Amino acid sequence: MSGEEKEKVKILHVANISTSATRDHIYNMFNYLGKIQDLKVYPSEGNITANTLLKTAFIKFDDERCVEVAQHLTNTVVIDCAIVCLPYPNPVIPDEESFFNSGGSTTAGQRQLPPHVTNKIQESDDGSALLITVDPTLEQLGLPAYPPLPADTDSAKVEEIRRTVYVGNLPKGVDGNEVLELFNMYFGEVMYARMASGPDALPCAYAYVEFSQQASVCNALQNDGFEFKERPLKIQHSRVAIIKPQAKTDEQALGEIEEAIRMGRNGDDRDRRRSRSPRRRRSPSPRRRRDSRDRDRDRDRDRRRSRDRRSRSRDRDRDRDRKRSRSRDRKRRSRSRDNKDRDRKRSRSRDRRRRSKSRDRKRERSRSRSKDRKRDKKRSRSRSPEKRRDKEDRKTEKKENENESSLREKLLEKKAARKDSSDDEWEEKPTPTNGEVKNEEIGNGDVVMASE
């Protein structure tokens, strides 16, 4: 086994456990964090006495990261006590006898620095006492040593400060969750982170980050100048501890538990009174009557408180419903406006398209009519010479016909005139006697055939 594996803390010390909690309770509570190799609960069942007030437990996990996560369960109420979860630096769970003989306590424990990290008091030049923390790992890695603290600083605060680093040169307005995720991912398990924007004149923000393990401080210091949102981070030792929210005390946790138990007991009493038959009821004694009156007063007080709580809860629910209703109405109105605007835009767009189409159709009709008119004009121009020629031909033909008819009439007249003249001559001449046919010249050389 290497030295690095030896330094890994895999054992969790759980203190301030209620005596009513069993081993199964503790196992089921921490088993979901990771695989448990071993679990010891002290004092054991055979060693619990009437003077035993609390229990303590040691849990060995298979993975050291489970120890880091389990520390966030500190102040979780189990039965009637708020538990405290701390890493146990030794590699082996102590047995019960050696644990109690060495002064081990079952009450709320206190976190300790790793064994190789030591504190010592040293006087400064001006005579004041300072607390110096020596970590050999920082020296080996060439990292700056822990800054000195006042000698009267509480040991618990010293341990917290030595697990905390200062982070500077953060962008203004940066989200704290982003810083938390960054350090969790690259440097180590973070227990707390506190953001500070600083004065307006300061060009950057800063933060304090507290790790679950002191060894994570070395990882963070080695990454001084880490690039985050195009800015080099300034990572240094912190001189102060993070101011944390007030933890719930045992008295507060116990008061809440007693209130819950009393409410449950009152409910059981009411159920028992309803189920009790009239025959089993007895006349109460004066003492019982006083106790009954006290219980009635307690019940009335509890009922009033419960009614008040329910009333406040109903008021909150009504307010929440009103807000949701207003939000829904606003969303509906917004959607309605959006739909109307969208419909108007669509209608305008359709109208524009219709008008555009109508204009296009009109243009096309106009162009078509213009083309038709031009075509007709061309046709009329091309047909007019033919018409003129036809008309002239008809006139010429008519004239020829008229000329022919007039000429025919003239010829007929001439012919008739010739005939009349030939008939007159025929009568004056004697008839031939020889029976021969003679040719006679008649006007203009026409030949006429005559028979006997």
UniProtKB/Swiss-Prot annotation:
Keywords: mRNA processing, mRNA splicing, Nucleus, Phosphoprotein, Repeat, RNA-binding. Extensively phosphorylated on serine residues in the RS domain. Gene3D superfamilies: 3.30.70.330. It is found in: Nucleus. Its main location: nucleus. Residues 273-290, 323-335, 345-360, 370-382 have a biased composition (Basic residues). One of its GO terms (cellular component) is nucleoplasm. Residues 258-452 are annotated as: Disordered. GO terms for biological process: mRNA splicing, via spliceosome. PROSITE patterns: RRM (PS50102). The keyword RNA-binding applies. Belongs to the splicing factor SR family. This is Probable splicing factor, arginine/serine-rich 7. It comes from Caenorhabditis elegans. The gene is rsp-7.
